[in-house]
Amino acid sequence: RDVLGSRGLGDVYKRQHLRECGIFLIIKKHPLQSGWSLNEGAYTNIRYVTEEMLQKSGIQLYELVGLMDGLISDYSSIAVDYMLLDRPLGYVLTDLESYRSTRGFVFEHPEEYMPGEKIYNLEDLKDYFSHIAVGEDPFKEERRRLLPAMHTMPKKSGYCEALAEYLNIK
């Protein structure tokens, strides 16, 4: 499962490829995750952040997300929100079956609602980074197709009126 964590040769491989692609990777682990090294000085192009670090800096997670060229997630709702930015998404699915059997999904076939690269191993991760580095976005059309199913899109004008109507205050 630990495609993004630091584990021996895979970590060396990942760091080298990130440098070759000119990518700076920020990894924010879930509060319930453990076992990742937060050795900030060990990497030149990877930083691990926690919710506590963001709070101490006065930064909201979504402020950081808005600056990102791409997002790698698993089954988190942040990926659904990130679709609104129309930027590349990658999904780490190394524990898909165990997640399905223990926690379950809202959708019967969740992969159909993941408009981005499916990452099962380091090679898939390398492909995702390579696409980001050269500006390729192979899932752009899939995101656009899924966007209306995942988000109620506002009108081009009349936002306030639509909101008032929705809230029954008009």
Residue ranges: model-predicted function:
Residues 59-60, 124:
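Short acidic active-site motifs
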Residues 14-55:
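Catalytic donor nucleotide-activated moiety binding site of glycosyltransferases and closely related
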Residues 155-170:
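C-terminal alpha-helical cap of glycosyltransferases
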Residues 51-56, 94-98:
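Short, acidic/turn-prone active-site loops that include or flank metal/cofactor-
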Residues 63-76:
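Acidic donor-binding loop of glycosyltransferase active sites
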